[in-house]
């Protein structure tokens, strides 16, 4: 797979808490130059990006990030504001405590509530695989499918681990046919980029892809 094809799968990501406007502009400029699938950035920058770049960049942001503890009502409010400001894609974090309490129906209903707000735009559901058992991961595949979300996403990049090939294979067995997969966290080499795409991931969340494909040493999400 050539570099251009890889980058079409990349959500070019900058979610570090110290991100400046200059950092954000660099991500936007790179996304335009290299035709990445989207930029994934903090919600506080959406309106400024939209005012500066218009439709030249596809804006993705995060909701309930990174711990997922916000109430459903809070996540809905975040989502509505993000969409109003110009976001086209929402990456939400589930309430992991609900999963641990086996309140799977509650998780499903929260995802469904956010998908109703997102409508025909894209909703990705971060399940933070590093904290879940195999049984819980399978339950979340079912929840994401039943709730009508567009993607299941492995990780925030802020947990104790990121995407693994084993989790991608597990997802493929248990998600519905309309659900796509996003790998994030630990996508840190060119080999990783190719491996996850070849395994069936439609999106990759990483801050490193552009640098890696340019042959640069990079650090980040």
From Swiss-Prot:
Pathway terms, separated by semicolons: Carbohydrate degradation; 2-deoxy-D-ribose 1-phosphate degradation; D-glyceraldehyde 3-phosphate and acetaldehyde from 2-deoxy-alpha-D-ribose 1-phosphate: step 2/2
Family annotation (SMART domains): DeoC
E.C. numbers: 4.1.2.4
Catalysed reaction equations from the record: 2-deoxy-D-ribose 5-phosphate = D-glyceraldehyde 3-phosphate + acetaldehyde
GO molecular function: deoxyribose-phosphate aldolase activity
Active site residues per record: 91, 153, 182
EC class: lyase
Gene3D superfamilies noted in UniProt: Aldolase class I
Main location (coarse class): cytoplasm
Subcellular compartments: Cytoplasm
InterPro entries: Aldolase_TIM, DeoC, DeoC/FbaB/LacD_aldolase, DeoC_typeI
GO CC terms of this entry: cytoplasm
One GO process term, biological-process aspect: deoxyribonucleotide catabolic process
UniProt superkingdom: Bacteria
NCBIfam families linked: deoC (TIGR00126)
Entry similarity comment: Belongs to the DeoC/FbaB aldolase family. DeoC type 1 subfamily.
Function description: Catalyzes a reversible aldol reaction between acetaldehyde and D-glyceraldehyde 3-phosphate to generate 2-deoxy-D-ribose 5-phosphate.
PANTHER family reported in the protein's UniProt record: DEOXYRIBOSE-PHOSPHATE ALDOLASE (PTHR10889:SF1)
HAMAP family, alphabetized: DeoC_type1
Name this polypeptide is given: Deoxyribose-phosphate aldolase
Source organism of the structure: Clostridium botulinum (strain Eklund 17B / Type B)
Lineage of source species: Bacteria, Bacillati, Bacillota, Clostridia, Eubacteriales
């Amino acid at each position: 797979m050539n570099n251009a094809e890889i980058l079409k799968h990349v959500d070019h990501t900058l979610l570090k808490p110290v991100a400046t406007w200059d950092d954000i502009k660099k991500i936007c400029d790179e996304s335009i130059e290299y035709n990445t699938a989207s930029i994934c950035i903090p919600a506080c920058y959406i309106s400024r990006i939209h005012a500066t770049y218009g439709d030249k960049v596809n804006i993705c942001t995060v909701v309930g990030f990174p711990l997922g503890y916000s109430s459903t009502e809070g996540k809905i409010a975040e989502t509505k504001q993000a969409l109003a400001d110009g976001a086209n894609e929402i990456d939400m974090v589930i309430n992991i405590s609900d999963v641990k309490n086996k309140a799977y129906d509650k998780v499903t209903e929260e995802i469904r509530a956010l998908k109703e707000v997102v409508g025909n735009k894209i909703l990705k559901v971060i399940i933070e695989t590093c904290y879940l058992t195999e049984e819980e991961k399978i339950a979340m595949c079912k929840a994401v499918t039943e709730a009508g979300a567009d993607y299941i996403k492995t990780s925030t990049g802020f947990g104790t681990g990121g995407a693994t090939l084993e989790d991608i294979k597990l997802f493929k067995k248990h998600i519905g046919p309309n659900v796509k997969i996003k790998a994030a966290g630990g996508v840190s080499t060119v080999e990783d980029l190719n491996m996850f795409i070849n395994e069936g991931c439609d999106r990759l969340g990483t801050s490193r892809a552009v640098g890696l494909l340019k042959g640069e040493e990079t650090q980040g999400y």
